Amino acid sequence: MIIDFASHFMTKEVAEKLSTKDNFNRLQKNFIPESSDPEFRIALMRKYGYDMQVLTQSTPILSGLKADEAAEICRISNDVIGKICLWYPDRFIPFVVVSLLDVRSAVNELDRAVKEWGCRGVTIGTNHGNRGLDDPQNAPFFERVCEHDIPVFLHPMDWHSYPLAEDDPGIMRLFGWPFDTTLAILRLVLSGTMERYPTLKIVTHHLGGGMFPFFAHRFEIKLPNLKHKLKKPLSESLNRIYGDTAVDGTAAALPCGHAFFGTDRMLFGTDYPFSPENGEVYLRENLDIIKKWNLPEADKAKILGGNAIKLLKLEMIMAR
C-alpha cells in the first residue's frame, strides 16, 4: 500500500477567488490546473503505482490575507476536497485546512469539516500573522484537535517581517520554509504545548524541515541553557512528532530523518504537484529513493503506507 501523505490540492474555485491577490500571483506559476481533476490524479497514481493520496490545501496561499478572507478560502477548499473524497473514497483522504488568524472561526470550521466530510487530519501554517503556534490564543484549537483525535499537518509559510519574503520569494521557499518548520516545532516543544496536550500529534512537512533531525543532539545539549523548562522528558514531546519524506528526491536526507524519527514516525510524501513535468518528477523521484533505500522491506512498507493507515485510522477503509 502506497499512500502519499503530502499531496497538495488547489481547487479551481480557490484559484479564481485569489486571482487578484499579489501573493497568489507569485505562487500561481506552480499551479497545475489539471491537478484539480481527480481523474487526472488517479491516472498518474496508476502510472506510478500509488494507492491513495491525502489531499491537503497548501497554506502559503493564505499569506497576506485578512482573517475573514482566509476563513472563506478555507471553507471553499474544504468543501471541494470533501466532495472529491466522498466521490473517490478508495483513492483520496480529506484533510481540513484552517487559518488561526481567527481561532474561534478555525475551531468551528474544524468541527464542520470533520462532521460533514470525515476529515482525517487538519492542515495549518507554521505561523499566523505575528503569532507563533505556541501563542496562548491557539489553545482552543489544540484542545479541539485532541478531542477529535486527528493529527496536525504543519506547512511552512512566508515571514512578512523578513525581507526575503518580498525581495526573493524563491529563496524564501527554498530554505526559509524549512527553517520556519523547524522553528514551529521548537516553539511547540519549548512552550510546553506538546506537554499540555499529551495526545497531540504533529506531522511536519519535509522531514521536520530538515534542520531538526540534523541538529537533534545539539538541541538536547543546549536545552538546559534555555529559559524554557520542560516538566517531562524531552522524548515524550518529540515522540509525537512525525515527518513526511517529501525531500524533493534527495536520498541523502532519508537516513538523517530516519535517525531522528525512526521507522514508525516517517510518512511517505511527495509535495505533488509542485515539481517539473506537471508534478511527475516528485511522484517518480520521491518514490524511487524509498524503493532504493537500504532499509528492510517491512520498514519501507510502514513508511510507504502502514504508518499512515495507523495514524489516520484507515483500517476500516483498507478492509473493504
Language model regions located:
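Mid-to-C-terminal alpha-helical segments outside catalytic/metal-binding sites
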Residues: 1-5, 9-52, 79-87, 108-112, ...
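Hydrophobic faces of well-ordered beta-strands that scaffold small-molecule active sites
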Residues: 3-7, 53-55, 93-96, 122-124, ...
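Catalytic metal-binding/acid-base residues of hydrolase active sites
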Residues: 8, 127, 157-158, 208, ...
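Active-site gating loops and adjacent loop-to-helix segments of metal-dependent hydrolytic enzymes
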Residues: 8-35, 160-179, 220-240
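Acidic-and-aromatic substrate-binding clefts and catalytic sites of carbohydrate-active enzymes
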Residues: 31-36, 62-63, 100-106, 129-136, ...
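Active-site gating/metal-coordination segments in enzymes
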Residues: 51, 56-185, 191
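Active-site-adjacent C-terminal substructures of enzyme catalytic domains
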Residues: 178-180, 195-197, 228-278
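Aromatic-lined glycan-binding groove of carbohydrate-active enzymes
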Residues: 189-194, 198-236
